């Protein structure tokens, strides 16, 4: 859900950025100085504190940010915001992105336009609620791994480039058996990421839906399918596989799953509260990021 919100200002601002990304330290430093000039309390996440001079500022571990801040500003690209979402969502801390990456579907504000933040801090912004997925890997009765994903839960080949055979169940109903290089289970947020390159549909972020996108399927009739986001997806790895595939959440963690194991995916119970400037427009973002503004040349 996207709504324009006018509410009391944000006064305690936590800053986060990814080390090793060009321009991030400089933007963090400029942002810190700008926030101080606006008489806001600035809190540095531990890694951000290593990148700039924050000797006079409070430094807080990532998992404790909500105790000290009412807004998290992330400097980086979409990958940086994905990482921040994994930290902010369980704490229900709103997130605003400053783009230092390439595409920037999720990070709205350019680093040379930090003054846009002033209106947001004064309570004038758009708040968008985006759901996440929760993935669970089980082998027998044992839970091997569990994690959340803003973009996608992905079944990938193992170390050998071989096809994977697996069964798909939705709400305990058998859907199909597939042989493919893998499967992407994507949220609307992730539909413009890895799933898009795999031929998946673009899902508007306000849709309560997720898409299952097969990767290089063995049969031409195998196509992406869009399902209700309230569904539970079960992927059963065929015992006939002679390799153990991997399961990844947002590309951040990779867990091996043995043949016969199951991957369960469902909507996570906490959403991401993503903050945008009041002039944010989703279709405008698509036009800019996907070069839809370019008109076809006339013959």
UniProtKB/Swiss-Prot annotation:
Which positions, given as ranges, span the membrane? none
Q: What is its EC number?
A: 2.7.1.23
Alphabetically list the UniProt keywords.
ATP-binding, Cytoplasm, Kinase, NAD, NADP, Nucleotide-binding, Transferase
Q: Where in the cell is it found?
A: Cytoplasm
**Gene Ontology molecular function:** ATP binding; metal ion binding; NAD binding; NAD+ kinase activity
Catalytic activity of the protein:
NAD(+) + ATP = ADP + NADP(+) + H(+)
Identify which residues the record assigns to the active site.
78
Question: Which residues are connected by disulfide bridges in this protein?
Answer: none
Top-level taxon of the source organism: Bacteria
- Residue sites binding NAD(+) per the record: 78-79, 151-152, 162, 179, 181, 192-197, 252
Question: What top-level class of enzyme does the UniProt entry assign?
Answer: transferase
What cofactor does this one take?
a divalent metal cation
InterPro entries xrefs: ATP-NAD_kinase_N (IPR017438), ATP-NAD_kinase_PpnK-typ_C (IPR017437), NAD/diacylglycerol_kinase_sf (IPR016064), NADK (IPR002504)
A Gene Ontology CC term for this entry? Answer: cytoplasm
Q: Name a Pfam family for this protein.
A: NAD_kinase
GO biological process, alphabetically ordered: NAD metabolic process; NADP biosynthetic process
Recorded family membership: Belongs to the NAD kinase family.
Any idea what job this protein has?
A: Involved in the regulation of the intracellular balance of NAD and NADP, and is a key enzyme in the biosynthesis of NADP. Catalyzes specifically the phosphorylation on 2'-hydroxyl of the adenosine moiety of NAD to yield NADP.
Full protein name? NAD kinase
Query: Which organism is this entry from?
Result: Coxiella burnetii (strain CbuK_Q154) (Coxiella burnetii (strain Q154))
What gene, per UniProt, encodes this protein? nadK
């Amino acid at each position: 859900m996207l709504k324009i919100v006018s509410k009391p200002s944000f006064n305690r601002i936590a800053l986060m950025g990814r080390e090793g990304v060009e321009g991030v330290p400089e933007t963090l430093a400029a942002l810190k100085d700008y926030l101080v000039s606006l008489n806001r309390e600035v809190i540095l996440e531990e890694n951000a504190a290593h990148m700039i001079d924050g000797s006079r500022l409070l430094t807080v571990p990532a998992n404790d940010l909500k105790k000290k801040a009412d807004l998290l500003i992330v400097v980086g690209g979409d990958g940086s915001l994905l990482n921040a979402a994994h930290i902010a969502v369980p704490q229900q801390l709103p997130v605003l992105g400053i783009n230092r990456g390439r595409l920037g579907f999720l990070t709205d504000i350019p680093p040379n336009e930090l003054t846009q933040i002033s209106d947001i801090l004064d309570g004038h912004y758009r708040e968008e609620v985006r759901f996440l997925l929760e993935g669970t890997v089980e082998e027998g009765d044992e839970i091997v791994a569990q994690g959340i994903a803003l973009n996608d839960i992905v079944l990938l080949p193992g170390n050998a480039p071989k096809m994977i055979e697996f069964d798909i169940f939705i709400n305990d109903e058998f859907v199909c058996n597939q042989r493919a290089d893998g499967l992407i289970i994507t949220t609307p947020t992730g539909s413009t990421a890895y799933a898009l390159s795999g031929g998946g549909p673009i899902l508007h972020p306000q849709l309560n839906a997720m898409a299952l996108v097969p990767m290089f399927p063995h049969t031409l009739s195998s196509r992406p399918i869009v399902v209700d986001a309230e569904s539970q997806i079960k992927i059963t790895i065929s015992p006939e596989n002679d390799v153990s595939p991997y399961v990844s959440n947002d590309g951040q963690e990779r867990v091996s799953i043995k043949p016969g194991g199951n991957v369960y995916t469902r909507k996570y119970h906490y959403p991401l509260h993503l903050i945008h400037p009041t002039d944010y427009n989703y279709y405008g973002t698509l036009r800019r990021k996907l070069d839809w503004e370019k008109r076809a040349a006339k013959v």
